[in-house]
Swiss-Prot record:
GO MF entry, a single one: identical protein binding
Family as reported in the entry's similarity comment: Belongs to the auxin efflux carrier (TC 2.A.69.1) family.
Tissue specificity field: Expressed at low levels in roots and shoot apex.
Domain of life: Eukaryota
Compartments where located: Membrane
Protein name, UniProt field: Probable auxin efflux carrier component 5b
GO CC list: cell periphery; endoplasmic reticulum; plasma membrane
InterPro entries: Auxin_eff_plant, Auxin_Efflux_Carrier, Mem_transp_PIN-like
Gene Ontology biological-process annotations: auxin export across the plasma membrane; auxin polar transport; auxin-activated signaling pathway
Length: 368
């Protein structure tokens, strides 16, 4: 049975996060302490230093030889179920579009919505919000599990999301009509057609996509911070090597800024927007439904199917209801795909997550 003391622990863990977010919001919206360029500099500091050190610190503390494979498999199964459901919806929409004369318009749009829907339903803020929250709810073992999920999300699912974005970009470029020929000579026309066919074939080849995704992943500090953290965890747990105190202290001094600066940066981002809801009420409701209902429901099915029960089942469901990952908005903005929807999901979802997560915590407390 969940008591008020347990609820207070959750609120006490979340309140400092909202305090940092409120300071960031007020420093721009009310006190005018930062300009837009200075906000970009703060965001850059967070993205390149604070969060990567935070991710490395927690990844280096896990035991790679004692991973909870059932929890990770349940998470993967739920993501696969969401991807298949979105693909089925896109195929059905494309079929209806073709049947009504919509033709080509349905396919590309369907794939775009699959990417956005997958981001909304499955990719959440596991590290910044999840670690302190689940530590308060269930203790150290829950914190260790959420770090495992976060590391897998960083080094597996984010690169896959980048791959999907690059595939969409390549297919969109390949589908673009070639420029009209400048001359009327038959040989010129044939040469132009051959060149267009060659260019299209090159665009469709796999290697440019793999290379583009690899470069994006290699430039992402969070990815190689997670990989380096796991590598160091393998060394320390395999050969029982202690991290030198000088290195541990150097990492910790930056890692401790990760949560606070991330929430502060999110507050800066919120203050720079004209309004919290920028994509309309309908899409906002859809995004919140995917974030707080569809994602946890898919995770519950996957976790139950793999035999998770008790606190493991509760943790799996609650981590799926965490706020939207900020990284998904960064990718959406970079690739120009529904950035306004992801922006609303990050801002409004973060504000709404506290009562939603408390409700999940209380309701799941009755499940045995």
């Amino acid at each position: 049975m969940i008591g008020w003391g347990d609820v207070y622990k959750v609120v006490a863990a979340m309140a400092p996060l909202y305090f940092a977010l409120g300071l960031g919001y007020g420093s721009v919206r009310w006190w005018r302490l930062f300009t837009a360029d200075q906000c970009d500099a703060v965001n850059r500091l967070v993205a390149c230093f604070a969060v990567p050190f935070f991710a490395f610190d927690f990844a280096a503390r896990i035991d790679p030889f004692a991973l909870s494979y059932r929890v990770l498999a349940a998470d993967a199964l739920s993501k696969l179920a969401v991807a298949l459901a979105l693909a089925a919806c896109a195929a059905a929409a494309s079929t209806r579009c073709c049947g009504s004369g919509g033709g080509k318009r349905g396919g590309g749009g369907g794939f775009s919505w699959c990417i956005t829907g997958f981001s909304l339903a499955t990719l959440n803020n596991t590290l910044v919000v999840g670690v302190p929250l689940l530590d308060a709810m269930y203790g150290k073992w829950a914190r260790d599990l959420i770090v495992q999920i976060s590391v897998v999300q960083t080094i597996v699912y984010f690169p896959l999301l980048l791959l999907a974005f690059e595939v969409r970009r390549a297919t969109t470029a390949a589908a673009a009509p070639p420029p009209p020929p400048t001359g009327t000579d038959d040989d010129d026309v044939e040469d132009g057609a051959a060149a267009a066919a060659t260019a299209a074939a090159a665009r469709r080849s796999l290697w440019p996509l793999v290379r583009a995704v690899w470069l994006k992943v290699a430039r992402n500090p969070n990815v190689y911070a997670g990989v380096l953290g796991v590598a160091w965890a393998c060394v320390t747990n395999r050969w029982h090597v202690e991290t030198p105190s000088i290195i541990e202290g150097s990492v910790l001094i930056m890692s401790k800024t990760g949560v606070g600066l991330s929430m502060f940066s999110m507050g800066l981002f919120m203050a720079l927007q004209d309004k919290i809801i920028v994509c309309g009420a309908g899409l906002t409701v859809l995004g919140m439904a995917l974030r707080f209902v569809a994602g946890p429901a898919a995770t519950a099915v996957g976790a139950f199917a793999l035999g998770l029960r008790g606190d493991l089942l509760r943790l799996a469901i609650i981590q799926a209801a965490l706020p939207q990952s900020i990284t998904t908005f960064v990718f959406a903005k970079e690739y120009g795909l529904h950035a306004e929807i992801l922006s609303t999901a990050v801002i409004f979802g973060t504000l709404a997550s506290l009562p939603v997560l408390i409700v999940y915590y209380i309701v799941l407390g009755f499940i045995r």
